[in-house]
Amino acid sequence: MLVRRLTLLLLCLAFLAGPAWSASKDVIYASESTAKSLDPHDTTDTYSGAIEKAICQGLMGFDKDLKVIPLLAESYTFNPNATEFTFKLRKGIKFHDGTPFNAEAVRVNIARLMSGKLKRSSLMKPVKELVVVDEHTVKFVLNEPFGAFINAVAHPGALMLSPAALAKFGDAISKSPVGTGPFIFAEWASDTVKIKKNPDYWRGPVKVDTITFRPVPENGSRLAMLRAGQAQYIFPMPAELLKLAQADPKVEIIERPSIVERYLVFNTRYAPLADVRVRQAINYAIDKQAIIRIAWGGAASEADSIIPSNLQFYKKQGAWPYDVAKAKALMKEAGYENGFKVLFLTPNPSNRLRATEMVQQQLKEIGITGEIQSMDVASFYNKLEGHRADDPTPVPFIGFGGWSSSTGDADWGIRPLLATASFPPASSNFGFFSDKKVDELIQAGLATADPAVRREAYARCQETLWPLAPWGYLFVDNLLAAKSKNLKGIYPLPDGGFSVEEAELSE
């Protein structure tokens, strides 16, 4: 039935499309996600951030393996206490609107981040002041030692925007980004974003003319587009359709390990979910292996700590066992033997919706019931960000969440999601989890640049968090993408984003 449906989709796409794509070097990227904003300082989703990185650049960045590399800065130094970081800037670079990139441009961007009003302001929370040393040198002076600061500077949330464009557009910069990157923003029509080649790019022009990012949340439709030649790259590649894709001689599969962890967000302001025994019961009641196999096509591994295994300072805790009897006993002990109702929230890409449906069915076994509310990815995160800790009537939700620890450091896998200071709108602790000891250990991990001390702090933090079950622990993705064989140079990154700078399309 699924194969017949895909065949019909292919025929329809071929009919609607007319002639195949010409040699104008235009790439269509079909994704399950929808761009939420193109303001890097006010964006929290990985998909939007990856598009932003094609347009804008930071002082530092990451390579294919999430190792920190210099970009708009050519070098940096820091003092022994890790409280001062000095960056030498590249000369001769201009933003797409002709504005010079220099120390003043850095000052404007960092001041904006330090305002505390934006979703990525927490990246610059350690900064006391930014000193403009000269036209091509800046110095960050921190309030206290912050061992992960270089990783924070490399984060997509610290990309540089044109000061002139910021002055012109204000908050509307989210629909009109102006950076220094290999691509220039072209248009945002409906849910589709288009970028075009920057002919004056400081590292030399890219080899494609345009890239169009088109949201296609239904898995089969994405693959059908690729096979029909109406997309050259799709992400994610639906794992359940892998055999079908592999049989197509025009399609090439890409698989990479990721740092994207999937979990259930619990609104701990809702009394039943505030009880650690209930949260533990939910973890015992979820058959993670079944969800991985059926909803994720096997392209994942069970979470065995609060952060993925390829993050700096990870420490294995052991996957949470599947034990419905234990779950029922904990529900009874907590006084919820008869269960309670919740609202299941999820983005609508088919694998996430299927996973949420499976969670819904599994939790019925311990009396937790409720309807599913699905929506596009951007609306899902808007909804979570709209809740507040002091809401008079907390929404009893369980949400299908995901997080990419995109600095590559344990700090970014824990602090934005689980620190008390990270309640919305400050950051992404959407479940309002709060624990004093956890907060102290998070700060201990930031208080030094000494790797041994940081490792110990984050090990203790993971050990403390794991039994508290602030989330429903699920799994860590393997990244699956697919592309046409005449495209090269676009590849998925461990954080769930992608790189397009090396894109090349042959005849």
Name what the model sees in each region:
Residues S33-G49, L72-E74, T99, F149-A158, ...:
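A structural "hinge/loop" feature
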Residues A30-P80, A111, V178:
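N-terminal lobe/hinge region of extracytoplasmic solute-binding protein
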Residues N102-N109, E135-V141, G181-P182, V208-T210, ...:
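Alpha-helical secondary-structure segments
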Residues P199-L244, T369:
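Ligand-site clamp/hinge motif
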Residues A154-V206, T210, G220, V324-A325, ...:
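Gly/Pro-rich hinge or "lid" segments in bacterial periplasmic/extracellular proteins
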Residues E74-K117, V133, K139, M225, ...:
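Aromatic- and charge-enriched surface segment that lines or borders ligand/interaction sites
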Residues V27, K197, A285-F313, S350-Q360, ...:
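Detector for C-terminal structural segments
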Residues T77, K88, S122-A165:
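Surface-exposed binding/hinge segments that line
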